[in-house]
Amino acid sequence: MQITFLGTSSGVPTRSRNVSSIALRLPQRAELWLFDCGEGTQHQFLRSDLKVSQLSRIFITHMHGDHVFGLMGLLASCGLGGNVKSVTLYGPPALEDYLQAGLRYSQTHLAYPIKVHKSKPGVIYEDDEYVVSCAYLKHRVTAFGYRVTEKDRPGHFNVEKAKALGIPPGPIYRKLKQGEFVTLPDGRKINGADLCGAPHVGRKFVYCTDTVFCDGAVELSQGADLLVHEATFSHQDAEMAFQRLHSTSTMAAQVALAAGVKHLMMTHFSPRYAPGNSVLLDDLLQEARAIFPNTDMAYDFLSYEIPRWNEVSQLLAKARS
């Protein structure tokens, strides 16, 4: 699981930051999921090493323009030359009307099917490898945070141990690799888990924007390996954050701390903190780190491989022993 930030500014783009969009790459299945699609997102694709042909799902947090104005252009371009097979979208109730109106009035005809699902709190998508759930956030319009959970996978299968038990290679190995019980022709019952190493614990990625500090964000983020949370304002502008229902850097850090996440990545920054102003983005970073030390600040085209923190901890423990 790797994320790439395609836009990290709030409201309007700047010379160095486009508006909101994050790509989640699932390389083992050559698939790409997009979270929000602000204006110019397709241009950001062209400036990155992402392949639009791998786009399969788009998750929209809310219907403000800096999160959706890039949708029509991206979907139209996918149809012209992206070789996209189909795209499934998830978002607020107004998303489908917005797309249908755009397609109708621009007389755009997509060369591939799209499906639009209305997001509701709870699980909105699940397959053999991943579960996607969402929760309400607290903003001026209906807004959702999204959580992607990678399912646990069995550990390394010990072929030599299986052979030593007299288990011949064949289709039965597939069940054993999945940690299942199997019955051998001689009547012996074998627990596949006994032939596998420690399981690979699934990673958890959470994306929360736009929102002021709220219980929904804390609950959705519980135990996340990576929380990407908006930090539109500095702590000194907290009054403005409450008025506009956005988060400060300290609110993002408080969510991370309360939810027990491993790593916080802040995004969605107001242009008011650009170089030359009295408060800079580095000040927001220091504010957050005072509460939650493992905090970083996103920037456009930053790619980040979400680590398996339990395996990192095991390696560190071995190195220290």
UniProtKB/Swiss-Prot annotation:
Keyword tags: Endonuclease, Hydrolase, Metal-binding, Nuclease, tRNA processing, Zinc
Question: Which Gene Ontology molecular function entries are recorded, alphabetically?
Answer: 3'-tRNA processing endoribonuclease activity; zinc ion binding
Q: Say which domain of life the source belongs to.
A: Bacteria
Q: How is the cofactor bound?
A: Binds 2 Zn(2+) ions.
Database matches in SUPFAM superfamilies = Metallo-hydrolase/oxidoreductase (SSF56281)
Q: Which reaction does it catalyse?
A: Endonucleolytic cleavage of RNA, removing extra 3' nucleotides from tRNA precursor, generating 3' termini of tRNAs. A 3'-hydroxy group is left at the tRNA terminus and a 5'-phosphoryl group is left at the trailer molecule
EC number from the UniProt entry = 3.1.26.11
Q: What does this protein do?
A: Zinc phosphodiesterase, which displays some tRNA 3'-processing endonuclease activity. Probably involved in tRNA maturation, by removing a 3'-trailer from precursor tRNA.
| Subunit and interaction comment | Homodimer.
State the name under which the record lists this protein.
Ribonuclease Z
Primary gene name = rnz
